[in-house]
């Protein structure tokens, strides 16, 4: 019985890994296709469409705004969660954030202030977490397309190589716990964007943004396996 149970448990694990690998391969190809297209519209519809195109046939809810509230235990927060948008307010919040950004003028900003503003906007859109899964990958693709409209020659390599840091930086930009002296900060996502846009060499290490050492179990891990590319080769975590 133990051998049989062990066999089927192993088979289940293998099947899950194969499914996740298949998902990553499919999403990777779709990302490349979307980024190769010289098209873009700055709107919530574009953002939602990117999600649909990335995950159609993978998630039943591809391109659909979630209708339930969510929490996600985060390794970088010692198992705590970011407060995501309520399901009832997602579309209105998306519309508001996009309208605010559309009406914002970068004309008189120096590049440093522009990067800070972009970091805040992208962090805000991600915090809404419009979908059940796939929010970070959707946000990454949208960000690349958006930054290209400013004339920046943005590739997907940095997002691929630092995919886990990118997500953790977005988490830190949206988490406050004043009782523990933790404040939301965009400094980490700004460091990522400065490397991306200005070719700086800021060190992007997950341990640098960990709120404190954690032994909490069942939270998203920052192990080497999670450092692999969310956009291309690693579908876990599925955001």
Enumerate the predicted regions with their spans:
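N-terminal, positively charged, Ser/Thr/Ala/Gly-biased leader segments
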Residues: 40-44, 48
């Amino acid at each position: 019985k133990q051998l049989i149970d062990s066999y089927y448990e192993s088979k289940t694990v293998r099947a899950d890994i194969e499914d996740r690998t298949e998902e990553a391969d499919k999403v990777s190809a779709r990302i490349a296709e979307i980024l190769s297209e010289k098209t873009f519209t700055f709107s919530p519809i574009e953002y939602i469409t990117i999600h649909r195109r990335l995950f159609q046939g993978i998630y039943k809810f591809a391109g659909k705004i979630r209708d339930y509230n969510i929490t996600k235990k985060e390794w970088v927060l010692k198992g705590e969660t970011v407060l995501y948008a309520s399901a009832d307010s997602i579309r209105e919040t998306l519309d508001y954030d996009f309208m605010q950004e559309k009406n914002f003028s970068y004309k008189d900003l120096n590049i440093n202030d522009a990067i800070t503003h972009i970091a805040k906007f992208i962090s805000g859109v991600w915090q809404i977490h419009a979908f059940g899964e796939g929010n970070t990958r959707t946000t990454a693709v949208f960000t690349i397309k958006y930054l290209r409209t400013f004339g920046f020659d943005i590739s997907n390599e940095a997002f691929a190589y630092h995919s886990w840091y990118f997500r953790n930086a977005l988490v830190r930009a949206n988490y406050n716990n004043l009782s523990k002296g933790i404040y939301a900060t965009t400094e980490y996502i700004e460091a990522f964007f400065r490397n991306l846009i200005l070719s700086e060499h800021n060190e992007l290490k997950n341990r640098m943004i960990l709120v404190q050492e954690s032994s909490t179990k069942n939270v998203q891990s920052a192990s080497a396996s999670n450092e692999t590319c969310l956009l291309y080769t690693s579908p876990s975590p599925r955001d």
